[in-house]
Curated annotation (Swiss-Prot):
UniProt remark on cofactor binding: Binds 1 Mg(2+) ion per subunit. May bind a second metal ion at a regulatory site, or after substrate binding.
Disulfide bonding pattern of the chain: none
GN (gene name): rnhA
Name listed for the protein in its UniProt record: Ribonuclease H
Swiss-Prot/TrEMBL catalytic activity: Endonucleolytic cleavage to 5'-phosphomonoester
Compartments, as annotated in UniProt: Cytoplasm
Single GO MF descriptor: magnesium ion binding
Its job: Endonuclease that specifically degrades the RNA of RNA-DNA hybrids.
Sequence positions that bind Mg(2+) 1: 10, 48, 70
Keywords on record: Cytoplasm, Endonuclease, Hydrolase, Magnesium, Metal-binding, Nuclease
Length: 146
């Protein structure tokens, strides 16, 4: 039986593009692990994707994951089938433009083959303590890039 893990993620950018950070909480039973990282020159969407990728990559075995994010870009790409369509259309959007962040989407796809992940949208900068903590971790990570 696969372990059930809950992950909250958030990405942030000071300027877009600009220095960015990401934060994540991984929860298994009574254990919570906080992780974060940064990049000196990036975009908010890259940090949102990066948070999910880095958190999933930390799991040491295939897991059942509920992943919560305030990123419509991330959650809608999965839940609305955009990611599958982009792949079928040779990484082109419905408007026939190149999909951005292909490198990160491809990393995420590999992780989604290992873990069974359900994506959930949460309202950002609201009353969700876990999302707010991830935002705080992301913003603290940005400060470390300066």
């Amino acid at each position: 039986m696969k372990k059930q893990v809950t992950i909250y993620t958030d990405g942030a950018c000071s300027g877009n593009p600009g220095p960015g950070g990401w934060g994540a909480l991984l929860m298994f039973g009574s254990i919570t692990r906080e992780v974060s990282g940064s990049s000196p020159a990036t975009t908010n969407n890259r940090m949102e994707l990066g948070a999910a990728i880095e958190a999933l990559a930390l799991l040491k075995e295939p897991c059942l994951v509920d992943l919560y994010s305030d990123s419509s870009y991330l959650v809608n790409a999965i839940n609305n089938g955009w990611l599958q369509r982009w792949q079928r259309n040779s990484w082109q959007t419905a408007a026939k433009k190149s999909v951005e962040n292909i490198d990160l989407w491809q990393k995420l796809i590999k992780l989604l083959k290992v873990h069974e992940v359900r994506f959930h949208k949460v309202k950002g900068h609201s009353d969700n303590a876990y999302n707010n903590r991830c935002d705080q971790l992301a913003r603290e990570a940005i400060k470390k890039t300066s």
